[in-house]
Regions:
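A cross-family phosphate/adenosyl-ligand binding-site feature
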Residues: 1-122, 127-205
Length: 205
């Protein structure tokens, strides 16, 4: 029986690459054929979190596929029906803004557009310091799009970065499974833990 193929696009929230790669590995373990796609920044920038070439090597080792990293390679995703489901994880505020406003100028975004033409599910795993700021309106737009699903997300640092939102990447496989059945995994807003005003008692939100 043919495996379910997941297009897995990574954009430039570099600090989340390690937990995201763990979920790529988990999806492969669950029997999915994972096709990696990289935005220009994710695929080319060396950062203190990971070298670009190292990211490519790890994706190839995990999935058995060379990452799609050009517009020319991403364009056939829809016409050739290459993906049953498409993930963008991490999805930066910049990528969410472009997606919400019809700008598809990177391999990750063009792949998403090409995939959506077939009325197939798109899963977004948010990672942005402006999730409750400038990016909020774009998240709101995407929440009501047909065939778009979100990995549950939370404020990752409500005191230090009160506008920041990050997906609970451990929920990505469950979100994928639900989205393949046309269901949004709930609850969408994940709990977060902070300390009280005196820094003494944990508060679960």
């Amino acid at each position: 029986m043919k495996k379910t193929t997941i297009g897995f696009a990574m954009t430039g929230s570099f600090c989340t690459f390690e937990p995201v790669l763990k979920q790529v590995e988990e999806l492969v373990k669950r029997g999915y054929d994972v096709l990696p796609i990289l935005s220009y920044h994710a695929g080319s920038l060396d950062t203190r979190f990971m070298q670009a070439e190292r990211l490519r090597e790890r994706l190839l080792a995990l999935t058995g596929h060379e990452p799609i990293d050009t517009l020319q390679k991403a364009e056939p995703i829809g016409p050739k029906r290459m993906t049953d489901l498409y993930v963008m994880s991490p999805a930066t505020g910049n990528s969410l803004a472009k997606l919400a406003n019809g700008i598809f100028d990177t391999p990750a975004l063009l792949g998403a557009k090409s995939h959506l033409r077939n009325e197939r599910p798109l899963v977004l795993a948010v990672s942005t310091n402006d999730g409750l700021g400038a990016a909020a309106q774009n998240i709101g737009k995407l929440l009501v799009w047909r065939n778009v699903y979100f990995v549950p997300f939370r404020q990752d640092d409500p005191i230090g970065k009160p506008r920041s939102l990050v997906a609970d990447f451990t929920q990505l496989p469950k979100t994928v499974s639900a989205a393949l059945s046309g269901v949004q995994l709930q609850p969408l807003i994940a709990a977060c833990v902070t300390m009280d005003a005196l820094g003494e008692q944990p508060i679960i939100h």
